[in-house]
Amino acid sequence: PPRWRQPALIARLLTDPRPVLDELRTAHGPIVGLGAGPMRLAVVGDPVALRELFGTPVDAFRWGHRFNVLGFVVGRTSLIVSDGPDWKRRRSAVQSGFSRRRLNGWVGDIVDRTDACIDGLVARTGGEPAVVDLYPVGRELVQGIVVRTLFGERLAARSGEIAALFQTAQDYLESPAYRQVPHPLPIGRRARVRADLDALRAIVDEQIDHLRREPSDDPLDLLAALLADGSLRDEEVRDQVITLLGAGLDTTAASLAWLLWCVALAGPGLWERLRAEADDVLAGDGPFDASHLARLDLADRCMREATRLHPAGSFAPRMAHVDVSVGGYRIPRGTLVLWSAHLAGRDPAAWTDPSAFEPDRFLHVRPEQKALADLAWVPFGRGARNCIGFALAQMELTLILARLAQRLDVAPTTDREPRAVGMVVNRPAGGVPLRVSRRP
């Protein structure tokens, strides 16, 4: 773009990214350079270029750079602001917490908590048709799952308090005030954010102290698993847990909202197909495990299609530590690379009718298109720095959708798609009001 337009484009990109990303691709293609000097950006949304980017050694990039706004919230030892040997050690410890056995154990808990959420919704509406914003309903469900997953049953009852403390910081990250450079002094709103973060860290520190005194035998408690691993200091454990809380709360809740909106708008035929699948797979009272999840093929395709269209993050940053080559372009050291799941997920070369919600597209992708489509589905990233909790997030979205279809009727109240808002998390403005009733 012309240099005189670039400051305004960058400002819009950091406040309302999706329209700007679409404009840049239409005008200049899926790889675009912006800015100069210390504010040099490269937007990368081409699927083939992303394969090259994700395949570049992680040491060629830095995540603990001055533009990583999340470090303020998650702590200085967090995975998402770590580099080099420290990152590798922390990543290894946290990755071990997402073992196959632990993921398998979380399946039943997700179904049980979804049932409790549905019971509460039915009690609230009397089972009669009512318009309900399922975004906050889903968010409360997700926060219960995430807090129980991270902290075990002891703190599960405090999930609302924990989520509210984190939400203060999340809202601040999305505000224009946070993106001031230099950042404002710790007064007013920023001071309140710090106070809530301090309160959240105190809760986690107290739970760590408790588990040091009384080790947990709960096989599903991720915090207990990190402490038992022994390779991280207590501060590191705390920062990773808060990172996982942030990564698993707002992002999954927003993805669930978009998923429910897409499926509801697709019409009753898709909902009936989801119900038939769930009736077959999730019959009875359980126990349910990963073998049941693997059979929810249609629900999984709906999850994949909704996250393709509406990834939780429209772009993610990494700073080039050395000169790198991506998609035939030289990206100089010091460039902030913004790779975009939004652009890749709507790439017209990878997807037929890319703006349409078509879960069955994954069944009949043309052979010549399949490899490109595989590269273009990156809502959870790819490579060594992908989303570490992607398996849990996909599990939650798939199981929640299947159980809702099994027990409720859901229909849209309008065919107007919600406006996507948010720089850090892509969420639907105004929520997702849907007509909900108990299954006949």
What residues fall within each predicted segment?
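Cytochrome P450 I-helix active-site segment
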Residues: P1-R3, V107, V111, A164-Q167, ...
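N-terminal membrane-proximal hinge/A-helix region immediately C-terminal to the signal-anchor transmembrane segment
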Residues: P1-T77, S82-P85, R89, V111-A116, ...
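Cytochrome P450 proximal C-terminal region
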Residues: R25-T26, T114, I118, F166-Q167, ...
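Cytochrome P450 heme-thiolate monooxygenase catalytic core
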Residues: R62-L70, D86-K88, R102-A254, R273
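Cytochrome P450 catalytic-core helices
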Residues: T251-E277, F390-L408
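Conserved cytochrome P450 K-helix/beta-meander segment immediately N-terminal to the heme-binding cysteine loop
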Residues: W339-E368
